[in-house]
Amino acid sequence: MAPKKCPETQKSPDVAVLLRSKSRRGPQELEPEAKKLRVQGPVSSRTCESCCLLAELSSLQIPSRSSSIVRDLYQHKLGKATWSSLQQGLQKSFLHSLASYQVFRKAAPFDRRTTSLAWHPTHPSTLAVGSKGGDIMIWNFGIKDKPIFLKGIGAGGSITGLKFNHLNTNQFFASSMEGTTRLQDFKGNILRVYTSSNSCKVWFCSLDVSAKSRVVVTGDNMGHVILLSTDGKELWNLRMHKKKVAHVALNPCCDWLLATASIDQTVKIWDLRQIKGKDSFLYSLPHRHPVNAACFSPDGARLLTTDQNNEIRVYSASQWDSPLNLISHPHRHFQHLTPIKATWHSRHNLIVVGRYPDPNLKSCVPYELRTIDVFDGSSGKMMCQLYDPGYSGITSLNEFNPMGDTLASTMGYHILIWSQEEDGSQKDHERL
């Protein structure tokens, strides 16, 4: 069956776009001019083009509230509305609320770009962020206390994966280019080292953990994937890909199901109970370009993949051989940019991803904005674009917290928190 392709230029009338004024921000908060991409052409022409594009985005309609959520719940209780229609109503209401989302917290604690991001599983205002220098910040932006900052080794210490320990949420797992996968506490103590390459030529690029099965899985730059128990026992170590394993993901509902994504242009699906060698995968999903990420949906029924060029795919567990949707979207690879990865919303059937406009694409318009794009997971249609002129860089990582009401984005050195917030509590946290 031919996959349904959704051009990224195809926008629904029901699209909400967030545009924020720079007037609230002081000159010291704006992105340094040296970091901005140079644009050829007269200033007057550039200003005109940008204003026209902003005006076009502003004219897009915001989804209207079709009915009361309370009424929808009541109709469902009476059996007059299906669960699917109730979910659609809740999603539409959430999309309407996105129109009022804004950056209300900001931090820039690192001297190198951010490389990884993880939300705390039980504290909706707490997240961990890692940097290219190996630094890790544990930040509860809901309180005024200073964040926990764990200093890394600097060059060569890039944090490639972060996961909180669900069995002890004052601990976290981390994989790094330093050549280790480890368990640490918030004081910086290393409690256990799961893998150590002891070589500068081998490092670990990806990480996932299952609290239910008590296993840790990590992938390295040589194509190996290692499965360990949380007490440190190695269960197996196999070369599953020809090149770097950029991402590993355990299915949240069936944690014996593993997805691995590689720059060898494949994503593979594995059954951990039946792995006997590199050829014992259940499915191999070929891509046209190297793959940055493969993420299971919260219900475990679908898989979202992001390549290193301009394609996002959605696969269904009922039909692995062909993607349900191909979404054309610019997010090309660049050496000094943290790879862009699309993620699922934690509650709704939505996909969130940062945009890196590509002038080589026919769909690219002059001075296209670096927005955060939100797509419908079923149709592949763009539903919303978030943009703040005060934070105009490329957001490589974007993830909603477990409650689904707050979005964290990383943009170069910066960490941005988007949410609905009253003006009286809007405060920017500068360098911490």
Swiss-Prot record:
Pfam families: WD40. GO terms for molecular function: damaged DNA binding; protein-containing complex binding; ubiquitin-protein transferase activity. A motif (DWD box) lies at residues 256-274. Residues 68-79, 87-98 are annotated as: Required for interaction with DDB1. Disruption phenotype: Mice exhibit elevated susceptibility to UV-induced skin carcinogenesis and enhanced rates of spontaneous tumor formation, particularly for lung and mammary adenocarcinomas. DDB2 is haploinsufficient as a tumor suppressor. The spleens of these animals are enlarged due to enhanced lymphoid proliferation while the testes are also enlarged due to reduced rates of apoptosis of testicular germ cells. Fibroblasts from these animals are resistant to p53-dependent apoptosis induced by UV treatment. Residues 1-31 are annotated as: Disordered. The DWD box is required for interaction with DDB1. Protein, which is both involved in DNA repair and protein ubiquitination, as part of the UV-DDB complex and DCX (DDB1-CUL4-X-box) complexes, respectively. Core component of the UV-DDB complex (UV-damaged DNA-binding protein complex), a complex that recognizes UV-induced DNA damage and recruit proteins of the nucleotide excision repair pathway (the NER pathway) to initiate DNA repair. The UV-DDB complex preferentially binds to cyclobutane pyrimidine dimers (CPD), 6-4 photoproducts (6-4 PP), apurinic sites and short mismatches. Belongs to the WD repeat DDB2/WDR76 family. This is DNA damage-binding protein 2. It comes from Mus musculus (Mouse).
